[in-house]
Regions:
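ATP-dependent carboxylate activation and anion-phosphoryl transfer catalytic cores
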Residues: 1, 7-240
Length: 240
């Protein structure tokens, strides 16, 4: 996330920014192809979870707000979005489902948008896989996305109905990084690990006391999810 992107404010800065982004993209992805798009100021990053089956049906499973980021990479996600209105949710959900149907999409996927301060939304990309932040969707609609993608692959049809949140969930990504060194990776030994628990708390992680975080991979080592009746309660649980 965030690689090969540059904001250009002045025409005279264009060539240097283009060359820099091309070099970064080539190094990161082995592909330096570039394109230009409108820069959306004060955006929110809101994505729609969808699922499609082998029989021409698709539905959406609500949105996730992923606007809290560093270096264009997600840190905190929540659902439902505090910025969302029922009208915007319906419009974005309809657009996401339409996109899935247009390519006969099978499986779970995420259609990602930027939303400006006037609630105009712009398509960014579609992730044709399970997302890091999928647990918050599972928690608020009681829907197992991993199970669903296996069933869809096995030829089981979906109902085709859209799902809407009954609860509020927040996910914090737990990263082995040093915030005092511009979030530089911080590999090493976890000497002691004590994870939180209780009602409305979910921890997804592979680490344990004595685990050594390697320097070779992404810095994320866990996800902490809180679920509650309201956003305020979910935030309070996360603070605790």
């Amino acid at each position: 996330g965030g690689k090969g992107m540059r904001i250009i404010w002045k025409e005279e800065d264009f060539q240097a920014a283009w060359d820099s982004a091309t070099h970064e993209a080539s190094a990161a992805f082995g592909n330096g192809a570039m394109y230009m798009e409108k820069y959306v100021e004060e955006p929110r990053h809101i994505e729609i979870q969808i699922v499609g089956d082998q029989y021409g049906k698709a539905c959406h499973l609500n949105e996730r707000d992923c606007s809290i980021q560093r270096r264009h990479q997600k840190l905190v996600e929540e659902t439902p979005s505090p910025f969302m209105t029922p009208e915007l949710r319906d419009a974005m959900g309809e657009a996401a489902v339409k996109a899935a149907l247009s390519i006969n999409y099978e499986g779970v996927g995420t259609v990602e948008f930027l939303v400006d301060k006037h609630r105009n939304f712009y398509f960014m990309e579609m992730n044709t896989r399970i997302q890091v932040e999928h647990p918050i969707t599972e928690e608020v609609i009681n829907y197992d996305l991993i199970r669903e993608q296996i069933l869809v692959a096995a030829g089981v049809p979906i109902s085709g109905k859209n799902y809407y949140p009954q609860l509020h969930a927040i996910e914090c990504r737990i990263n082995a990084e040093d915030p005092f060194r511009n979030f530089a990776p911080s590999p090493g030994m976890i000497t002691t690990l004590h994870t939180p628990g209780g009602h409305g708390i979910r921890v997804d992680s592979h680490v344990y006391s004595g685990y050594r975080i390697p320097p070779n991979y992404d810095s994320m080592v866990g996800k902490l999810i809180t679920v509650a009746q309201t956003r305020e309660e979910a935030i309070a649980k996360m603070h605790r």
